[in-house]
Amino acid sequence: MTVHGNTKTSPMVTLLAGGVSGVIAKSTIAPLERVKILYQVKSKMYSFNSVYGLMKNIIKNEGLAGLWKGNTATILRIFPYSAIQWTSYDYLKNNFVTDKKSSVQIFIAGSLGFSCAILLTYPLDVIRARLALSYSNNNNNNSINSKNLNSSTQPPKVLKNGIGAVNIEKSIDFNGYKTKGLFKGIWRGILPTLYGSIPYAGVGYSSFEYFKRIAPDSFRNEKGDVIGIYKLISGGVAGGLGQTAAYPLDVVRRRIQTTGYGDGKGVENLKHSTLKTMFTIFQKEGIYALFKGISINYIKVIPTNGVAFLTYETLCDYFNSKLNKN
């Protein structure tokens, strides 16, 4: 049993609340996530006007569902991922953290819980990235501005679930698994992902707990609990801090995951270690490339993390109240 507030919460509740909160949060910002992935694997700079143009042309070429291409794979991954993440974090926090006010201990619990979720669900993240990268005009040019999306090429049929008529088997890369080994197939990019999970989850969880701890009375109810709007905002800010700390590793991860897929075929193969890949990107494209897409990422961080933190705690409170009545 874990403890949520002053109420004991069973692992089944944390699993369900964690999974549902992740699905709701990720589905809300799926269009921005797809655009971010497209920019991360390109060498061209962008502006908010080009982001708008890219989204408009995706809708034109693939329909509105094109903005959610890859979201079905995201949902299949995010439910178990978020469920494991929250349950692992709660278990570690309530069984191994001796001082709930210790940001260092919360940092470690958050990082370990996040890493557990990554290890168990990583292949689905690779598939999602490759599906999102595949978009309708098969243009090998590295530029992704709106002009290059205005193609006369007949766009592929987009399925109702938003994935698009793509070769799922190719995205999974069974042949790569057989011929290249575990870490070069569907596990490509796992190491930078794990490296990035340490600052991302550690900073995110420790910041959120700190913000809740220092919440003024004006943001607490009569029971002394932090109110929803404060959780929403503090969760978003905490997520933004974590993303900033981990973002260069996220860019490296996406480059490694998508090398040779979709429009990523035009990008130089990155088969080195994480640090060498990061240095290669920095050397060829500059420091900006390691933070490519971070501004659009900030736009989605507040709703994603805010909704996730708020939804998770709200669902835990709801399920606990129902169980206590029985």
Curated annotation (Swiss-Prot):
The UniProt record lists the keyword Nucleotide-binding = no
Tell me which SUPFAM superfamilies the record gives: Mitochondrial carrier
| Solcar repeats by residue range | 9-95, 101-214, 226-318
What would be one Gene Ontology cellular-component term for the protein? mitochondrial inner membrane
Q: Which GO terms describe its molecular function?
A: coenzyme A transmembrane transporter activity
Membrane topology of the entry = Multi-pass membrane protein
Its domain of life reads Eukaryota
**Where is this chain primarily localised?**
mitochondrion
Q: Where is the protein situated, by its record's location annotation?
A: Mitochondrion inner membrane
Q: Does the keyword Mitochondrion apply?
A: yes
TM spans (from-to): 12-32, 64-84, 104-124, 185-205, 226-246, 290-310
Which Cys-Cys disulphide bridges does the record give? Answer: none
UniProtKB keywords: Membrane, Mitochondrion, Mitochondrion inner membrane, Repeat, Transmembrane, Transmembrane helix, Transport
Q: One Pfam family of this protein, by short name?
A: Mito_carr
Query: One of this protein's GO BP terms?
Result: mitochondrial coenzyme A transmembrane transport
The UniProt entry, under PANTHER family, shows: SOLUTE CARRIER FAMILY 25 (PTHR24089)
The entry's function note states: Mitochondrial solute carriers shuttle metabolites, nucleotides, and cofactors through the mitochondrial inner membrane. May be involved in the accumulation of coenzyme A in the mitochondrial matrix.
Identify its protein family: Belongs to the mitochondrial carrier (TC 2.A.29) family.
Q: What is this protein called?
A: Mitochondrial substrate carrier family protein R
Taxonomic lineage: Eukaryota, Amoebozoa, Evosea, Eumycetozoa, Dictyostelia
Q: Which gene encodes it?
A: mcfR
